Amino acid sequence: MTTYNHAPYIARAIESVLAQRTSFAVELLLGEDCSSDSTPDICRSYAARYPDRIRLVTSEHNVGMRANYRRTIEACRGRYVAICDGDDWWCDPEKLERQVAMLEADPSLGLCYTRSLRLFEGTGRELHYPEVMLTDFDRLLFNNTVENCTAVARRDLILRYYAEVRPEEHPEWLTDDAPMWLWFAAESRIAWLDAETAVHRMLPQSVSQSGLYRKRIAFCDSLMDTSLWFDARYGAGRHRYRLLCRRSDVALWVLSYHGPVGEYLARRGWPSTPRATDCCSKRYSSDARERLREGDPRPPCALRP
């Protein structure tokens, strides 16, 4: 469990892990990244109360989200690693028991994930995610439905991922979980459990939910660039053209609601003609606004393979 400035949420996240009913021992690693609020005190308090169940992973200086994520995972000692960020929580006390049972029953499985409830902080809006659970590499390239807070993976494969992919050499990747799950899809089999086991809190300040459309586009571009890299390395580049189109589609969808489409066309080096801009605006703006009115933040293409 990685955490940074999660004082209002971290206790609930920790308690949800402690509430798991399992036939095996569970060790909770708290990766606390020198928060400026009371998160460190809360984490230290829990670690002191449960010394046999909780281990604190921290340092004297902030190391950043991605480094904290990695050092916390690498500190794990069990056969399996389950992930829950400090602002999320598990809502099913049988979550770990059921997922580990699936992995134990089939050694070819590297990862098991479940459905989640996305809770949008501030508005209280809820979204049951995903509508379609994907497991194959080709489809996950376009729509990675593996929610981090629902995943349970084999630790030896995670270590292989870090050694083989070397994500630290890719600062352009803005997340650590998306590339990891793409690697699992390419190098092992993925299973899904049809149950809602976790709540993913969508904070306004998170990179994926930023209201600033330039940051939102940068995040979407990063996800597509990650998919392009994995397609080139593990998919022989067979999806390159479609992934490039998808990257543009998603960016244009964001701009159709938040900003000028012509700006993105110019930034990508496309001819920003009135006809092209008008065509893109009409194509995306009406559909995007309708979906957002219905409470669905995803672009029109999000569920298509």
Segments predicted by a language model, with ranges:
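A conserved acidic beta->alpha catalytic loop
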Residues: E32-D41, H61, D85
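Conserved donor NDP-sugar-binding/catalytic core segment of glycosyltransferases
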Residues: E94-E126
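Membrane-interface aromatic/basic loop that binds lipid-linked glycans or pyrophosphate carriers
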Residues: L228-R233, H239-R240, L244-P305
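Short aromatic/hydrophobic "clamp" motif used to bind/position activated sugar donors
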Residues: V81
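Acidic helix N-cap motif at the loop->helix transition within catalytic regions
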Residues: Y9-A11, D37-Y46, A67
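Short, acidic, metal-binding catalytic loop of nucleotide-sugar glycosyltransferases
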Residues: E15-A25
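Conserved nucleotide-sugar donor-binding catalytic segment
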Residues: T114, H128-R214, F219
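Glycine-rich, basic loop-to-helix element that forms the pyrophosphate-binding segment
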Residues: S59-C76, R98
